[in-house]
Structures are given as structure tokens and as C-alpha cells.
């Protein structure tokens, strides 16, 4: 028997839009995509990254000059999956603004700070967490050493990305990511992970 809570969480609301050709129904995420809003919600894994990357590429093809908004509520996840989203954000022509709602932890925080400079935001009660990558391996000793070396390479690369987008020194980034480091929006702004804390939608946004 399915968990009723899981079933409820898998239900996607539908919205109906009136057009000149009559009514048209969209799932809520497709409707947001029409407004160039991508909602990154939940753990980052290969399935999610393929969907996010596809949406980014679709919106670029639709209008390469128009901004894309990415709303993030994620506990993090698989590093390589997150890096595929990160690389696509940097690769495409449209500017990508980011906004954390709820939490941006681990890989979620990296995607948050990867937004266009000056366009990285947080709602006032969101939380941001940074840390170093983790992994558990078993098998032959040589294989464990190979995986440990790869994890170290990923750690070094992630540190470089945080340095690039926060403006902090490598030492400060390494120290900050040594353990789970939870930040308020104010602390995240001071560290350079975000640019502004927003409580209300701006007048210009409300009119668009």
C-alpha cells in the first residue's frame, strides 16, 4: 500500500488558462516555465538535473536575451548532477537569477551562488548550508584510494567555484566548508553567496 503522504506529494496541481482558442490546462510547473521560472525542488540527482538542464536549454532557444528565474529549495545531492546544472547555467546566453525559498544546502547552495552577479536572492527565513563533499566506498583497497582521490579533486573544484562566485579567498572558503556550516540570509549575504534579501516582490516584477 502506498504511503498517502507520498501520494499527496506526487500530485501536481493543474491550472486552466483562457486563450483565444478556448481553455488550456497546464500542470503548475509547465505554467511557471511559460513565465521563464524554473523550480528546483528536492534532492539533486541525475533525474532532476536532466529536467533542469532541459528547461534551461529550452528557455535559451525560446529567447536567448531574456532572463531566467530559478527558485531553489533543495537539501543538496549528487555532486556531478549538480555540476551539470551549474555548467549549463554558465553556458547558456540568458542571465539566470536565483532565489532560495526554504533551504539551499550543499549542492543547492552552489547553484544558488552560481546565479548572475547581483541577481542572487534569499527570502528572509530561508537557510543556506555549505560543506565539503562526502562519500562512502567499499571494495578493494586500491579502488577505495581511487575514489578518495576523485573526491578530493571534486572538493578542490567546488572550492574554486565558491571562490569565483563569492569573492572570498581560498583559505576562507576551505575553512567555511570544512564542516556543515549553516547560515542565515544575512550571513550568506556577508559571505557573498547571495546579493540581496527580499521580503516582497518588487513593483516592477509585480507589473510584469
Swiss-Prot record:
Keywords, in A-Z order: Cytoplasm, Hydrolase, Protease, Serine protease
Catalyzed reactions: Hydrolysis of proteins to small peptides in the presence of ATP and magnesium. alpha-casein is the usual test substrate. In the absence of ATP, only oligopeptides shorter than five residues are hydrolyzed (such as succinyl-Leu-Tyr-|-NHMec, and Leu-Tyr-Leu-|-Tyr-Trp, in which cleavage of the -Tyr-|-Leu- and -Tyr-|-Trp bonds also occurs)
Enzyme class label: hydrolase
PANTHER family: ATP-DEPENDENT CLP PROTEASE PROTEOLYTIC SUBUNIT
Classification via NCBIfam families: PRK00277.1 (NF001368), PRK12553.1 (NF009205)
GO biological process per UniProt: protein quality control for misfolded or incompletely synthesized proteins
Protein name: ATP-dependent Clp protease proteolytic subunit
EC id: 3.4.21.92
One annotated GO molecular function: ATP-dependent peptidase activity
Family: Belongs to the peptidase S14 family.
Amino acid at each position: 500500500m502506498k504511503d498517502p503522504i507520498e501520494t499527496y506529494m506526487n500530485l501536481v496541481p493543474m491550472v486552466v488558462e483562457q486563450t483565444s482558442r478556448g481553455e488550456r490546462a497546464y500542470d503548475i510547473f509547465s505554467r511557471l516555465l511559460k513565465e521563464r521560472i524554473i523550480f528546483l525542488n528536492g534532492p539533486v540527482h541525475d533525474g532532476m538535473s536532466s529536467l533542469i538542464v532541459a528547461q534551461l536549454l529550452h528557455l535559451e532557444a525560446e529567447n536567448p536575451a531574456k532572463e531566467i528565474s530559478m527558485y531553489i529549495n533543495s537539501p543538496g545531492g549528487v555532486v556531478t548532477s549538480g555540476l551539470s546544472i551549474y555548467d549549463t547555467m554558465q553556458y547558456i546566453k540568458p542571465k539566470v537569477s536565483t532565489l532560495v525559498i526554504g533551504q539551499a544546502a550543499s549542492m543547492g547552495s552552489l547553484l544558488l551562488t552560481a546565479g548572475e552577479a547581483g541577481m542572487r536572492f534569499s527570502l528572509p527565513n530561508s537557510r543556506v548550508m555549505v560543506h565539503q563533499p562526502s562519500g562512502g566506498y567499499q571494495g578493494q583497497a586500491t579502488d577505495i584510494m581511487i575514489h578518495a582521490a576523485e573526491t578530493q579533486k571534486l572538493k578542490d573544484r567546488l572550492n574554486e567555484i565558491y571562490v569565483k562566485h563569492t569573492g572570498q579567498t581560498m583559505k576562507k572558503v576551505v575553512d567555511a566548508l570544512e564542516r556543515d556550516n549553516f547560515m542565515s540570509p544575512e550571513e550568506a549575504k556577508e559571505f557573498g553567496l547571495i546579493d540581496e534579501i527580499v521580503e516582497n516582490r518588487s513593483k516592477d516584477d509585480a507589473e510584469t
